[in-house]
Curated annotation (Swiss-Prot):
GO BP field: carbohydrate metabolic process
Annotated SUPFAM superfamilies: UDP-Glycosyltransferase/glycogen phosphorylase (SSF53756)
Family, as annotated: Belongs to the glycogen phosphorylase family.
NCBIfam families: more_P_ylases
GO molecular function, one term: glycogen phosphorylase activity
Designated name of the protein: Uncharacterized protein MJ1631
InterPro entries: Agluc_phsphrylas, Glyco_trans_35, Glycogen/Maltodextrin_Phosph
Domain of life of the native organism: Archaea
């Protein structure tokens, strides 16, 4: 592969480094761990968020509370480099820090900040919060990542290819056009799209972008020719880049249909997401499954459930039992993922909790300005407060995510059909003998086809209303509860652990990026 700079708004590397919000960051983190082991010439560019995404805490009544707590790190190297970018006709200084390879076992990553004394108050706030709801700050963040990141890479590295993971760093391509022309840019940029719906692809008023410096010194007429007006980031990236990739086979089919009208667009290839088994998988579970040692697997799973249930008790005052089937719904809290679905028929759920001895845990972070989803989170808090065997946890970050995946028995995934480009949380759960139960969307389409006996599929993949999906889940859970903790269950778990890493480990993904995108 060509030496490549990988630009991404977020990286989930390790619990102490709060530079991520969700799946995009989890994917980038796993990619960089695998690429390091494979000795791939990959370097990352991201932003050092002063306050991270946000800290998810509880108020006095136990409801979710958003807090912004400044983060400090002593493991990032100050490389003594500041580069200027122009935002709103104002010079903003961007300072770079470097995460060296040996700190967390990744390829190197440069983290950028504007939160330094050389900048005015507004400029300092640009890198305060990941995915800031203020649109002006949001665009400014993209300029810092794209143009500031390019200038840092130009000073520090010798790369031959620029990869945009999502089109957030799109100002990068206009900087390349400005310096080298459109044809050079087309030969030296690639990008990854993660969005299966047209409305999920970012658009902005082209004159606003021009006034903010998004296009640098490139003529706005060329920008409009590439991205239209309103300016569509993904359309522009498809026209400017050498190649693009979707993040699952189904997502590629969706993208080819969705963007069939775009003239002169690049090829879209499929590279299905994956996760790093060496970070996410418990080594004892790996060993037990490999030997098909059911007693060893069961014993370790019970130990991991105890660890998870200590966290449950600490947060909620509820005592969960390790001999009960434990179902977890945990991921980014957003409407299309349907976190509410298990409570669609409350009486059916109560019956499962009582008669089938099932336990349920929710966790996940809504966007701090998504008041509807924060209300949904708090509705689940109130619904489960007096519900024995059901609860919801706060603080869904890498540490808790790993704890939930290792301590659960069923990993529940309920996206609306054709809304999930890939998803990855179920991969890492499956690596830890937590069996995936999902609607037929995203990566699950491939997993269910490869090994239909290693997961549970919700519904027929056609009907998708909440009542139908909820009823399918309740019926499945009734069957699964009867199977749980039998020899058949643990054999299924062993197969799941062994088979998932054949295709959904990050080393396969990193090799495919090298072969299909970075060639």
């Amino acid at each position: 592969m060509k030496p490549t700079a990988y630009f991404c708004m977020e990286f989930a590397i390790h619990q102490p480094l709060k530079t991520y919000a969700g799946g995009l960051g989890f994917l980038a983190g796993s990619h960089f761990r695998a690429a390091k082991r494979l000795n791939q010439p990959l370097v990352g560019v991201s932003i050092l968020w002063s306050y991270g995404y946000y800290d998810q805490l509880r108020d006095r009544e136990g409801k979710m509370k958003v807090e912004y707590i400044r983060k400090y790190y002593d493991f990032l190297e100050d490389i003594k480099l500041k580069v200027p970018v122009t935002i709103n006709n104002n010079t903003v200084w961007v300072k770079a820090y470097k995460l060296e390879e040996d700190v967390f076992g990744t390829c190197p990553i440069y983290f950028l900040t504007t939160d330094i004394p050389e900048n005015d108050d507004f400029s300092r706030t640009i890198t305060h919060n990941l995915y800031d709801a203020n649109n002006i700050l949001h665009i400014a963040q993209q300029i810092v990542l794209g143009i500031g990141g390019y200038k840092v890479i130009k000073e520090c590295e010798n790369v031959k290819l620029f990869h945009m993971n999502e089109p957030h760093p799109l100002p990068l391509v206009f900087k390349l056009i400005e310096e080298y022309g459109l044809e050079y840019t087309r030969e030296h940029t690639v990008f990854t799209t993660h969005t299966p719906l047209p409305e999920g692809n970012e658009t902005q008023d082209i004159n606003l972008l021009k006034s903010m410096g998004f296009f640098g010194n490139v003529d706005v007429k060329l920008a409009e020719k590439l991205g239209g007006n309103p300016f569509n980031y993904t359309v522009c990236a498809l026209r400017v880049c050498k190649r693009a990739n979707a993040v699952s086979k189904k997502h590629k089919e969706v993208c080819d249909r969705m963007w069939s009208w775009v003239k002169d667009r690049c090829e879209i290839v499929a590279i299905t997401n994956a996760q790093d088994k060496y970070y996410w998988q418990d080594p004892v579970i790996r060993e037990a499954a490999k030997k098909y040692d059911i007693d060893m697997l069961r014993e370790r799973k019970m130990e991991l459930k105890e660890i998870l249930f200590e966290e449950v008790a600490d947060q909620t005052g509820k005592i969960f039992k390790k001999d009960r089937l434990t179902v977890v719904w945990a991921r980014r809290f957003t409407a299309y993922k349907r976190p509410h679905i298990l409570l669609h028929d409350e009486m059916r759920l109560l019956e499962l909790l009582k008669k089938k001895r099932i336990q349920v845990i929710w966790a996940g972070k809504p966007h701090p300005n998504d008041h509807n989803m924060i209300a949904t989170f708090n509705w689940i808090v109130s619904k489960t407060r007096d519900m024995k065997g059901a609860t919801i946890l706060t603080g869904y970050e890498l540490k808790l995510s790993k704890m939930l995946k290792q301590g659960s028995d069923i990993w529940l995934n309920t996206p609306k059909l054709n809304h999930e480009a890939s998803g990855t949380s179920g991969m890492t759960a499956s690596m830890n003998a937590s069996i995936h139960m999902s609607t037929l969307d995203g990566w699950h389409v491939e997993w269910a086809k490869m090994y239909p006996d290693d997961s549970f599929t919700i519904g027929d993949g056609v009907r998708d209303d909440d009542a139908y999906v909820a009823n399918c889940i309740y019926n499945l859970l009734e069957e699964v509860a009867d199977m749980y903790d039998t020899e058949r269950w643990w054999m299924k778990a062993c197969n799941c652990v062994n088979h998932i890493v054949e295709y959904f480990d990050a080393e396969r993904m990193a090799k495919e990026y090298a072969e299909k995108l970075y060639k």
